Every structure is written in structure tokens, then in C-alpha cells.
Amino acid sequence: MTSRGFRLDQDNRLNNFAIEPPVYVDSSVQAGWTEYAEKMNGRFAMIGFVSLLAMEVITGHGIVGWLLSL
């Protein structure tokens, strides 16, 4: 016998935990990183690498030599 989501057990005691909501299972595996975040991270890494190469061409020193000359 069910009434408004409650169920009576064999001893006619009210068991309001008898009807559980269905469990939703997501089949896609994610570790917290979204596709958008991965694209942005890759783009910023490319910008940083290209600017590092440009600085090396302009100054004639690498990043370590430039930092040591400060």
C-alpha cells in the first residue's frame, strides 16, 4: 500500500524511506576538467611559448639568462 510516497511494512508500520528516487548514472567519465578549460589552457600555453621564443629572438638571451641579468 502506497500513499504519497509512504509505504506500510508487514506489521502495518509506516516506512517513509521505502520508496527511493531513481539513481542517475552518467556514463561519461570526467575528472573535473571540461573541454573548454582544456582548450583555454592549451591556448594560454601556446601564447606563453610563442612569447618566450619571441623574447629570445629579440633579446638574444634565453629566459634563464634574461632573469639572471635583472
Swiss-Prot record:
One cellular-component annotation, GO: thylakoid membrane
GO biological process, one term: photosystem II assembly
Principal subcellular localization: membrane
Short motif (Chlorophyll-binding motif): ranges: 38-43
InterPro entries assigned: Chloroa_b-bind
Protein task: Involved in photosystem II (PSII) assembly and/or repair under high light stress; probably important for quick stress responses. HliB-HliC heterodimers associate with PSII assembly intermediates with CP47 (psbB) and bind chlorophyll and carotenoids in a 1:0.6 ratio. They probably protect against photo-oxidation during assembly. Complex binds mostly beta-carotenoid, but minor amounts of echinenone and beta-crytoxanthin are also detected. The complex efficiently quenches chlorophyll fluorescence, contributing to photoprotection. The Hlips might regulate tetrapyrrole biosynthesis, maybe at the level of aminolevulinic acid synthesis and probably stabilize PSII assembly intermediates.
Protein name: High light-inducible protein HliB
Organism, as annotated: Synechocystis sp. (strain ATCC 27184 / PCC 6803 / Kazusa)
Gene: hliB
